[in-house]
Amino acid sequence: MNHFSDTQWVVERAKSIGFDRCGVVRAGRFPELAQTSEWLARGYAGEMEYLADPRRSDVQNVLPGIASVIVCLLNYNTAHPLSTESTLQNDQVEPRGWISRYAWGRDYHDVLRERLDRLADCLREHFSEPFKARSYVDTGPVQERVLAKHAGLGWLGKNTLLLNETLGSFFFLGVILTTLDLAPSLSAKELPPPDLCGNCRQCLDACPTQAFVEPYVMDARKCISYLTIELRQSIPEELREPMGRHVFGCDICQDVCPWNRRAPLAALQEFQPRVRPSQNEEKAGISLCPGDESLFLPKLEWLAGLSETDFREMFSGSPIRRTKWRGLVRNACNALGNSALRPGTRVQVRVSALLERLAASAEPVIAESARWALSRIQ
């Protein structure tokens, strides 16, 4: 096989299924993969021990006999304001927080996996020879961004994310590892897309927790996304105030990136902010968010007051489940502590009562965060 026409067929089929971009790369050891060991040795991965899986250094370790990797991009950009443009000044009525744009809608793992499975089925129908295919969406021992770069889909930016000249960085990556011998999207004489970051350092300078050790190198232990999602313990106190009102993930280094200023919008309804995820909001007598968009600028009191049962129900099928109930409540307490509420106001009295209740929680990370927040608003 190994005809470029086959690769063109795969790319066109992927686009017909709904992917915005698709590229193919030959399986191999790429120089960027070797840099991971040094990054891990510096301790930058924090509690993410799964990143030390030795299979991540070579896709041959993941699928024996692998010949090619199909990399697909799916845009999740919505028409809503960026975190750097959104106002959070209405604190004296109802403090609000920020959830990362990618988590507003349906769990992207499910959305991409469905499409990757359809693409794999198309491959089986099209190619007569027997082959193996295995798909991953941000869950396996695969470094998707490196593979995407060498498939010609973009370059690795100073914020460590994959950047595409047209799409910016608001997209998800999914891959299919296969024993099919497909021609690569880039010929042997072609290099991956050039680094177009130039002298820009807006992402580096905008990070409120100074998570970037240097361009292209992040200390995940200081990244707001890591702190709000992956970290299971209490958030280091010196990082709580810089985190501001973030309760799940962070978009700042993407929101300030010039390549995202003209990025096209996603058409998929799955990635729009969830609307009224459960009847519990009605039962509690509260309205979740402006315009009934429950996860865009969510009310912090609502998030902090969620029971574990309500959390499981409301965030079923959402990537927010990864932080777990105690993590989300911890984050909401931290954000309330950064809300600059005026003493004696109705909202300050109400929030103080909520935090006092949470300060007595049997969950240490919740109780500790609530006590810190109380000390900030009283």
Residue ranges and their predicted role:
Residues 310-314, 345-359, 378:
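Amphipathic alpha-helical scaffolding segments comprising HEAT/armadillo-like alpha-solenoid repeats
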Residues 19, 202-225, 232, 246-270, ...:
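Iron-sulfur cluster-binding cysteine motifs and their immediate structural context
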